[in-house]
């Protein structure tokens, strides 16, 4: 006779997390390996944790791509890399005026955080000064929180960004350390961890996450969440691979919507007090179950991503309202 596997009590696990009991890697793997029919129970349990720490608030973030393409790195997932043949817009730095204009567009989209992103391995000091000039004007004229994502930083650059008023610095780990060489050869996993630590040491809130669906195992997927816990990332963007034509990963099978939901739930269980953001690939990978993702996550991007389109801001606002949730404006 076939043995019936005992179902996990996901609610009990959630209340254990709320009571600050330690979740194990085995617990995280169990979430990822659970039968798809359990997904609503898992998301309901994740919501217990999410609601305890964040209530019904949803934080909106907006990206501006201030420098597109022209990157010397060979990241296999990225349409902006030197080896990509994807047909994207390529341009050098936007003017400070354009960057500041983008901040006011972020406000119109009800975003509380404005993310200034530039392609490339690392910024020059001149480029950092260019960003700082825009940041200072934005700080003087808005209440937005500012996040930067400019590549690898040295200690001096991190310090100057902090002094200028940058609240958060994004530098994703992208994938598990064991999987890193399969997606990039021009820098290492440790290089990425180093920049996250430099930003934190400078007094900037660290933002770091991953792109799921790049060939990592279930166990590695869980270990990524614990690694983000270890480096104490305050904000964790969960991206889901969009297999862009013209990139080395164009043939990679994308995750199913339920697999994406399990990742979001697992991330909430492992990092209960952190901002969990549904990021790149949200519309393409989660599709019609996007709203369910917000029962684990408490943050999304509004508008377009770096080189892929997002849905209209009104659709995001409507989704949040339909759930009975509320937009958290201008709060980090």
Swiss-Prot record:
Pfam families: BATS, Radical_SAM. Transmembrane segments: none annotated. Residues 53-282 form the Radical SAM core domain. Its cofactor is [4Fe-4S] cluster; [2Fe-2S] cluster. Keywords: 2Fe-2S, 4Fe-4S, Biotin biosynthesis, Iron, Iron-sulfur, Metal-binding, S-adenosyl-L-methionine, Transferase. Its EC number is 2.8.1.6. GO terms for molecular function: 2 iron, 2 sulfur cluster binding; 4 iron, 4 sulfur cluster binding; biotin synthase activity; iron ion binding. Binds 1 [4Fe-4S] cluster. The cluster is coordinated with 3 cysteines and an exchangeable S-adenosyl-L-methionine. Binds 1 [2Fe-2S] cluster. The cluster is coordinated with 3 cysteines and 1 arginine. GO terms for biological process: biotin biosynthetic process. It comes from the Bacteria. PROSITE patterns: RADICAL_SAM (PS51918). [4Fe-4S] cluster binds at residues 71, 75, 78. [2Fe-2S] cluster binds at residues 115, 147, 207, 277. Belongs to the radical SAM superfamily. Biotin synthase family. Catalyzes the conversion of dethiobiotin (DTB) to biotin by the insertion of a sulfur atom into dethiobiotin via a radical-based mechanism. Homodimer. This is Biotin synthase. The gene is bioB.
């Amino acid at each position: 006779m076939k043995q019936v596997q005992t179902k996990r009590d996901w609610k009990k696990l959630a209340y254990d997390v709320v009571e600050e009991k330690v979740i194990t890697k085995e617990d995280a793997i169990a979430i990822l390996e659970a039968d798809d029919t359990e997904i609503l129970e898992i998301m309901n349990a994740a919501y217990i944790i999410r609601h305890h720490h964040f209530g019904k608030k949803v934080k909106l973030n907006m990206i501006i791509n201030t420098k597109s393409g022209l990157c010397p790195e060979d990241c296999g997932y990225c349409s902006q890399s030197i080896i990509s043949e994807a047909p994207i817009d390529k341009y050098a730095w936007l003017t400070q005026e354009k960057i500041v204009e983008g901040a006011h567009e972020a406000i119109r989209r009800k975003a509380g955080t404005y993310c200034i992103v530039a392609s490339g391995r690392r910024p020059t000091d001149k480029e950092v000064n260019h960003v700082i000039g825009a940041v200072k004007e934005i700080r003087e004229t808005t209440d937005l929180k500012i996040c930067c994502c400019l590549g690898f930083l040295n200690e001096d650059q991190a310090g100057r960004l902090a002094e200028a008023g940058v609240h958060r610095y994004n530098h994703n780990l992208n994938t598990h350390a064991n999987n890193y060489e399969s997606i990039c050869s021009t820098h290492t996993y440790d290089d990425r961890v180093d920049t996250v630590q430099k930003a934190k040491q400078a007094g900037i809130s660290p933002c770091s996450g991953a792109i799921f669906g790049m060939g990592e195992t279930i166990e590695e997927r869980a270990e990524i969440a614990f690694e983000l816990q270890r480096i104490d990332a305050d904000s964790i963007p969960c991206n889901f691979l969009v297999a862009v034509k013209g990139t080395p990963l164009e043939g990679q099978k994308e995750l199913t919507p339920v697999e994406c939901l399990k990742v979001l739930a697992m991330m909430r269980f492992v990092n209960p007090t952190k901002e969990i953001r549904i990021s790149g690939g949200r519309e393409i990978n989660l599709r019609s179950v996007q709203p369910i993702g917000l029962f684990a996550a408490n943050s999304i991007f509004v508008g377009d991503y770096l080189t892929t389109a997002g849905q209209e801001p009104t659709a995001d606002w409507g989704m949040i309202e339909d759930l009975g949730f509320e937009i958290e404006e201008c709060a980090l």
